[in-house]
């Protein structure tokens, strides 16, 4: 789902001016949408109540009061983006020049302070990110006076184009926001074929819902920033100035009722000054406003037309009108969504930002030549062809009525929200907006749009008062954060119990045993040796290790395991995900299982712990409190030492609760800080930047070291990606291509598999598994945990060594286990659990596909080559040709 708001810069008003001109002209001729009319408290204060004119929309974008012409927001003058060029080619040329002349620092190339400043500006631009740019004047000076070359050598015609705009300035303000409120498809279908009276009632109901949503945003989401003792603080403003534009169809010509609300980015604070709105506060309340709109719309349409609704999709907040909720019918009239999904699949992208980009990339002009009468006649015919005629449409408008929530329903809803599957199911804290959002999706249809809002807000206040505990406040945004007593009590009890075990004296290894192990492994670094000493000698019931990316923590855990076992302890290994247990197995842990399996075995008494047991949990920072707490309870009752290993700054917990972080703050942790994975210093710094949240700096480092390739055409990108994969494959580097979307993964797998088959690397016999076919020699990835029965985990890479087509089994050799293992996969495992392994889905937030040789995956040397233009994709080459960063 796309984010229901878009920031609009100065200069983007042409679309809205077109809306004004066309809508006014075509509305009265029966061909266009209804004209936009002013809404909001700010508009009312300014006396703006009628239709918006083109001049008034221009005033909105120019930061003026549309009524008086008074200047509200001052221009933010910046160099025209068209007068800038990418800094990366210039920096690369400067580095080459410095290498030729034996100069250590790039500014030393300059013959004057001014030119040295230009050099530093290029360096700063690259550090700002891969899209860093510099003024064309800087390019011209450095090219001619430092590099002694014509700037066209580096930039070609792009230099001439930028030179034409040198010295120009533009207003870089965000002038307005476009809030889009969309109705469910069944509402659009009812409007398409329901007749004039139904359409009037639908329009009135949607207008009521819009009033509810905008009113909520005005009270809770609109404000300005003001300095308070040297830091920004949120302050409320007097309301919004908006212009809604109603639309009845999508760009694909389908029925699609939605409203674009143009909101001026200006607010007057209590001090009387006009400034830009606090966008962070606005975004914090957007989803609640969007789902309140849908709840209010359901109430209004039930009140006006008697429609009844399906259950609400908790993810989208939408419900469909009963009788128009058939999935096939909805998909038949959703061509626009299909266009966006196809574009995302082709580009290999996903997520909110990608969906917004897809909406823009696939945008086509609406057909404005068709009259309103003709449009509705066409839709009526199409609905009839789909089996929805006049009788069916009349049948959905029956005696449906909203109602207030009953006491029993309310208690059940509050209990659910405050329980493990409620607001803290996947996050440890929440805000008032989160509560309103959740209630808008859970409460029954209200008697009216206004009561839908009142009901949600009142119940939210009760929930916060009776079922929540305030745990913090964002002073700048003025937003309180809450948690549930249930989760806090679990975390509090867990930390208290672990604290009481600090002097328990369990799991202690004799000093001479520890020394023997460390002497055997003289390559252990000081931080690794100190960690082994600490966890084996402390005697604490719960010990923690925080290992930075590339610090060799799993290998160091193997040393600790060796010491414990040498002194007679039974060591068990566990991890939140199956593939992480494989890493423990590679380091000598003979008894490993997932945390879910471990908890199940303990609860069903299939596994017993005692004082001579040691439990090592890798990637423990990924565990939510509700899984970590019972695990520690079992260990405490048995007197078992627990070693939790992870990095709370590298991986967030999968479930709610920062249990690992809370324990680390109270108990402390051994730290593994030395990056042993990356070889070059700049790479180590880049990884540290990622860990510290400075992603832009990390990307800038890759750009500065020429690790980023840009493609304008997706096919060119994919060809380069496969070429890199093939080169690494021929070099026996066992490469894997990573991509975001399943469709792109499947396409790349097909290409790679066909390439190997054409070169005679695959067997002739094929085993069909679903819609896939496998041959001997194929690389596969296993998709399910079967540690006990087969000894394989979800995510295990393997190569097919034999097929038994009649019995539908395959034999595979694992590729990343040390040593490799041969496993026969039975029929029950194959279906849906074995997929081609040349390409896999990428779950980390990288911008596109990546080709990673085995050495790169194991050592972290894997280069992202991002393409920030239309492709938004990346590829990488072999570490033999380039060293590269770790993905964490």
Question: Where do the language-model regions lie?
Answer:
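Conserved helicase motor core of P-loop NTPases
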Residues: 493, 502-505, 530-531, 637, ...
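ASCE P-loop NTPase helicase motor core
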Residues: 435, 542-703
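Active-site phosphate-binding and catalytic loops of NTP-dependent enzymes
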Residues: 215-233, 448, 757-764, 788-790
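Intrinsically disordered, flexible peripheral segments
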Residues: 1-418, 423-427, 431-440, 455-457, ...
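Interdomain "pre-motor" coupling segment immediately N-terminal to P-loop NTPase/helicase cores
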Residues: 441, 445, 450-513
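C-terminal accessory regions
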Residues: 301, 305, 639, 692, ...
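N-terminal pre-P-loop "Q-motif" helix
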Residues: 521-539
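Conserved nucleotide-binding/hydrolysis micro-motifs of P-loop NTPases
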Residues: 9-14, 185-188, 248-250, 267-269, ...
């Amino acid at each position: 789902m796309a984010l229901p708001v878009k920031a609009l810069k100065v200069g983007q008003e042409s679309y809205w001016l077109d809306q004004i001109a066309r809508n006014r002209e075509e509305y009265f001729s029966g061909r266009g949408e209804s004209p936009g009319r002013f809404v909001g408290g700010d508009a009312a204060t300014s006396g703006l109540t009628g239709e918006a004119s083109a001049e008034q929309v221009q005033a909105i974008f120019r930061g003026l009061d549309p009524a008086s012409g008074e200047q509200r927001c001052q221009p933010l003058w910046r160099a025209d983006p068209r007068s800038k060029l990418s800094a990366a080619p210039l920096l690369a040329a400067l580095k080459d020049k410095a290498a030729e002349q034996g100069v250590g620092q790039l500014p030393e190339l300059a013959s004057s302070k001014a030119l040295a400043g230009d050099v530093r500006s290029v360096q700063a631009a690259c550090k700002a990110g891969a899209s860093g740019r510099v003024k064309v004047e800087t390019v011209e000076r450095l090219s001619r006076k430092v590099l002694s070359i014509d700037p066209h050598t580096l930039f070609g015609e792009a230099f001439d184009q930028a030179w034409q705009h040198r010295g120009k300035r533009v207003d870089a303000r965000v002038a307005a926001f476009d809030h889009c409120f969309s109705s469910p498809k069944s509402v659009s279908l009812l409007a398409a074929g329901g007749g004039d009276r139904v359409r009037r009632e639908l329009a009135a109901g949607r207008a009521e819902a819009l009033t509810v949503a905008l009113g909520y945003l005005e009270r809770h989401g609109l404000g300005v920033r003001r300095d308070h003792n040297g830091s920004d603080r949120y302050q409320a403003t007097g309301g919004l100035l908006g212009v809604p534009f109603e639309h009845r169809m999508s760009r694909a010509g389908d029925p699609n009722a939605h409203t674009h609300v143009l909101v001026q980015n200006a607010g007057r604070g209590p001090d009387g000054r006009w400034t830009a709105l606090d966008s962070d506060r606005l975004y914090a309340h957007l989803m609640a406003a969007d789902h309140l709109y849908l709840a209010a719309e359901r109430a209004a349409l039930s009140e006006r037309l008697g429609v009844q609704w399906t259950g609400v999709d908790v993810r989208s907040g939408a419900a469909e009108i009963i009788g128009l909720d058939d999935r096939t019918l909805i998909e038949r009239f959703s061509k626009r969504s299909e266009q966006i999904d196809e574009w995302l699949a082709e580009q290999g992208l996903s997520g909110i930002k990608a969906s917004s980009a897809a909406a823009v990339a696939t945008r086509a002009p609406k057909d404005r030549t068709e009259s309103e009468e003709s449009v509705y006649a066409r839709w009526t015919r199409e609905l009839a062809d789909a089996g929805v005629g006049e009788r069916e449409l009349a049948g959905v408008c029956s005696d449906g009525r909203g109602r207030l929530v009953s006491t029993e329903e309310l208690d059940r809803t509050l209990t659910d929200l405050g329980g493990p599957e409620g607001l803290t199911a996947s996050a440890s804290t929440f805000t008032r907006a989160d509560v309103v959002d959740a209630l808008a999706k859970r409460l029954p249809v209200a008697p009216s749009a206004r009561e839908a809002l009142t009901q949600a807000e009142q119940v939210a206040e009760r929930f916060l008062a009776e079922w929540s505990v305030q745990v913090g406040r964002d002073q700048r945004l003025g937003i309180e954060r809450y948690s549930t007593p249930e989760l806090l009590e679990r975390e509090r009890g867990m930390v208290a119990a672990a604290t009481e075990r600090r002097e328990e004296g369990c799991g202690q290894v004799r000093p001479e045993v520890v020394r023997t192990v460390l002497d055997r492994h003289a390559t252990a670094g000081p931080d690794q040796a100190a960690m082994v000493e600490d966890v084996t000698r402390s005697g604490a019931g719960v010990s923690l290790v925080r290992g930075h990316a590339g610090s060799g923590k799993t290998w160091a855990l193997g040393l600790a395991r060796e010491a414990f076992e040498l002194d007679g302890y039974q060591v068990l290994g566990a991890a939140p995900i199956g593939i992480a247990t494989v890493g423990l197995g590679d380091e000598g842990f003979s008894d490993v299982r997932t945390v879910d399996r471990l908890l199940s075995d303990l609860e069903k008494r299939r596994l017993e712990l005692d004082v001579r047991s040691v439990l090592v949990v890798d990637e423990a920072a990924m565990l939510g409190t509700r899984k970590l707490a019972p695990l520690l309870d079992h260990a405490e009752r048995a007197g078992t030492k627990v070693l939790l290993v992870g990095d709370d700054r590298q991986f967030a917990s999968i479930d709610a609760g920062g249990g690992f972080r809370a324990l680390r703050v109270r108990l402390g942790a051994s730290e593994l800080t030395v990056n042993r994975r990356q070889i070059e210093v700049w790479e180590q710094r880049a990884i540290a930047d990622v860990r510290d949240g400075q992603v832009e700096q990390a990307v800038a480092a890759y750009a500065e070291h020429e690790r980023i390739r840009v493609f304008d055409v997706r096919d060119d990108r994919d060809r380069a990606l496969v070429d890199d994969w093939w080169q690494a494959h021929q070099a026996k580097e066992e490469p894997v291509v990573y991509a975001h979307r399943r469709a792109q993964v499947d396409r790349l797998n097909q290409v790679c598999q066909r390439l190997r088959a054409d070169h005679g690397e695959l067997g002739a016999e094929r085993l069909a598994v679903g819609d896939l076919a496998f041959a001997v020699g194929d690389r596969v990835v296993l998709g399910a945990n079967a540690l006990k029965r087969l000894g394989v985990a979800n995510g295990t890479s393997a190569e097919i060594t034999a097929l038994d087509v009649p019995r539908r089994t395959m034999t595979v050799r694992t590729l990343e286990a040390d040593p490799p293992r041969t496993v026969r996969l039975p029929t029950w495992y194959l279906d849906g659990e074995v997929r081609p392994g040349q390409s896999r889905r990428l779950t980390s937030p990288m911008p596109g596909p990546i080709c990673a040789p085995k050495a790169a995956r194991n050592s972290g040397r894997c280069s992202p080559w991002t393409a920030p233009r239309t492709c938004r994709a990346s590829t990488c080459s072999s570490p033999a040709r380039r060293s590269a960063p770790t993905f964490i």
